[in-house]
């Protein structure tokens, strides 16, 4: 422990040593120059062989050299001091730059402790404090995920019991409970999505990822299911897909859930016999787009629509968690979710920008 404490230096100490070294070097240059000029002047005074005219000429020359000996070293020292101070500050603040790069390159889900790479006391203290903050945030997020999983798990059994009771009540008393049963089914589906999101979210935080081929593992397995869903309202599903597949780090099940929720949201808010277009762009990054032909959205409330329990229109079914789950899945994949109106014609445009291993976009 004693050796470690002695190895740790202070930023203030480094700054004082650097400035002290700069001042010492500049002062030595000035002293050497003045000593050289003083030696010439003393030699002139003791030289008796010079005539009066020669002495006056030499005196004038020495005066000019004395002025130059004061002004030129001062200018040189100012320039050298600025250059050396710049280099010293760069040397002292280099650990801060490394710390900034380490934090800037991190994703929102990466709460691993920062490595202690600096022997400067202040930098080590900041790194330790940030690591403590990461630990508290990680524990809070784990508690939130566990709470979500526990609540969702506790809701599954009573919801199944309520559904069974409604079916028996409908059979025995000839009462139409189909609308209530449909609501129960939607709640069960939402609970299962929350359970899935909580489980995979914990795996993501632990660093467990897999390589996902977006067309093969996400799009193709969902095409029949989504087409069957849209047939209930005679809606058409158009696919605009690239020829080549693209691979990213993530979870195929979560990405399928993201696609299902976006298409289901468009299906719910689009009129019958309308068209829903699903496009995948992989030129610069993975961008999934879902366009519908509904009434569009109020763009002043875009930030509210992706929050939990907020619905676009209370006339339609749903709990209001679909877009919130989409936002969370996009964040887990180091991506972003955007919702706006279509540029051409009525309808909404949902965009999910995801990252590939070699590309981290900053979408606007």
Curated annotation (Swiss-Prot):
Keywords: ATP-binding, Cell inner membrane, Cell membrane, Kinase, Membrane, Nucleotide-binding, Phosphoprotein, Transferase, Transmembrane, Transmembrane helix, Two-component regulatory system, Virulence
GO molecular function terms attached to this record: ATP binding; phosphorelay sensor kinase activity
Signal peptide as annotated in the record: none
Record carries keyword Transmembrane: yes
Post-translational modification: Autophosphorylated.
Histidine kinase domain sequence ranges: 150-358
One of the record's GO cellular component terms: plasma membrane
Membrane-crossing residue ranges in chain numbering: 15-35, 66-86
Domain HAMP: start-end pairs: 90-142
Cell location: Cell inner membrane
Function as written in the Swiss-Prot or TrEMBL entry: Member of the two-component regulatory system PmrB/PmrA involved in regulation of virulence. Functions probably as a sensor protein kinase which is autophosphorylated at a histidine residue and transfers its phosphate group to PmrA in response to external pH and iron.
Name listed for the protein in its UniProt record: Sensor histidine kinase PmrB
This protein's encoding gene: pmrB
């Amino acid at each position: 422990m004693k050796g470690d404490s002695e190895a740790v230096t202070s930023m203030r100490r480094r700054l004082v040593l650097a400035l002290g070294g700069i001042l010492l070097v500049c002062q030595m240059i000035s002293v050497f120059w003045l000593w050289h000029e003083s030696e010439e002047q003393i030699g002139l005074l003791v030289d008796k062989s010079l005539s009066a005219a020669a002495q006056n000429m030499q005196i004038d020359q020495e005066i000019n050299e004395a002025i130059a000996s004061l002004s030129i070293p001062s200018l040189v020292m100012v320039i050298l001091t600025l250059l050396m101070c710049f280099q010293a500050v760069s040397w002292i603040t280099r650990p801060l730059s490394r710390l900034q790069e380490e934090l800037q390159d991190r994703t929102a889900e990466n709460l691993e402790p920062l490595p202690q790479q600096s022997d400067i006391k202040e930098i080590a203290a900041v790194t330790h404090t940030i690591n403590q903050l990461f630990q508290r945030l990680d524990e809070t997020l784990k508690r939130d995920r566990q709470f979500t999983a526990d609540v969702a798990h506790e809701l599954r059994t009573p919801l199944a019991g309520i559904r069974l009771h409604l079916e028996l009540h409908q059979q025995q008393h000839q009462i139409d409970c189909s609308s209530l049963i449909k609501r129960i089914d939607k709640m069960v589906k939402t609970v299962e999505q929350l359970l899935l999101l909580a489980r995979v979210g914990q795996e993501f935080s632990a660093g467990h990822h897999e390589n996902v081929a977006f067309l093969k593992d996400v799009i193709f397995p969902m095409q029949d299911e989504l087409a069957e869903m849209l047939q209930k309202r005679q809606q058409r599903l158009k696919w605009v897909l690239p020829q080549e597949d693209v691979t990213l780090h993530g979870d195929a099940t979560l990405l399928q859930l993201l696609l299902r929720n976006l298409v289901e949201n468009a299906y719910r808010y689009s009129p019958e016999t309308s068209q829903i277009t699903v496009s995948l762009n992989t030129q610069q990054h993975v961008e999934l787009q879902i366009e519908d032909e509904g009434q569009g959205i109020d763009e002043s409330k875009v930030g509210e629509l992706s929050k939990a329990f907020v619905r676009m229109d209370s006339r339609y079914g749903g709990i209001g968690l679909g877009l919130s789950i989409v936002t969370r899945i996009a964040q887990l994949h180091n991506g972003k979710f955007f919702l706006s109106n279509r540029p051409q014609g009525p309808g909404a445009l949902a965009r999910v920008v995801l990252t590939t291993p070699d590309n981290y976009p900053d979408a606007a």
